[in-house]
A protein has these predicted regions:
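Glycine-biased, small-residue-rich flexible motifs in mid-sequence functional cores and linkers
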Residues: 1-188
């Protein structure tokens, strides 16, 4: 069963005004195809350029591309962390990106107190916040049962707008966009 529970407390580092800005969650595979990378970059830049705060989970792949693209567009971005703010950034490959987000008027937030390390359960809970604090969620690319499906399911459960990128079948291996196809065909 999905949870529709707002966090009791949020820990924040950076521009907390972004919590009141219209936001779009950009989510997807940690290993997107070239077409997935292009889509993540395009949609993040477009939304950021039009005044939306880009929300994602600072994971490798689509999440990192979403944050980077928002910054390149001089837009706003919020990274939701699955650990305390004082703990080493997960994944460690995105430590510099997290620093850049804060330095460029962005925001890092977590519902976990200081000293709390990242766990797989908390990664799922992070996905709940991504869809929960966003007007809409955009699925860039996901296999069936990919990690992005947590955010998709939370968006559906909480009746948020949900979009999936539609790819030309000859450009992308169908196995890496199966969840996109399901959503586009009207899965509910």
């Amino acid at each position: 069963k999905q949870k529709n529970v707002a966090p009791i407390l949020l820990y924040a580092k950076g521009n907390t005004d972004l919590l009141n800005q219209k936001s779009v969650a950009i989510i997807g595979s940690r290993t997107p195809t070239i077409e997935g990378e292009k889509a993540a970059t395009y949609f993040s830049k477009e939304f950021a350029s039009n005044g939306f705060n880009i929300v994602s989970g600072l994971a490798l792949g689509c999440d990192a591309l979403a944050h980077q693209s928002a910054l390149k567009a001089n837009g706003a971005t919020t990274a939701i962390l699955a650990h305390g703010l004082d703990v080493s950034i997960y994944p460690k490959e995105n430590k510099d990106l997290a620093k850049s987000i804060v330095e460029n008027n962005g925001l890092l937030i977590s519902e976990y107190g200081f000293g709390t390390p990242c766990t797989s359960y908390q990664l799922v809970e992070r996905d709940r916040l991504q869809s929960g604090m966003s007007t809409a969620t955009v699925l860039i690319q996901s296999k069936i049962n990919g990690g992005s499906m947590h955010a998709v399911n939370f968006a559906l459960y909480n009746q948020r707008l949900l979009y999936a990128v539609n790819y030309k079948a000859n450009l992308v291996d169908v196995s890496v966009i199966q969840e996109n196809i399901h959503l586009l065909e009207g899965r509910n």
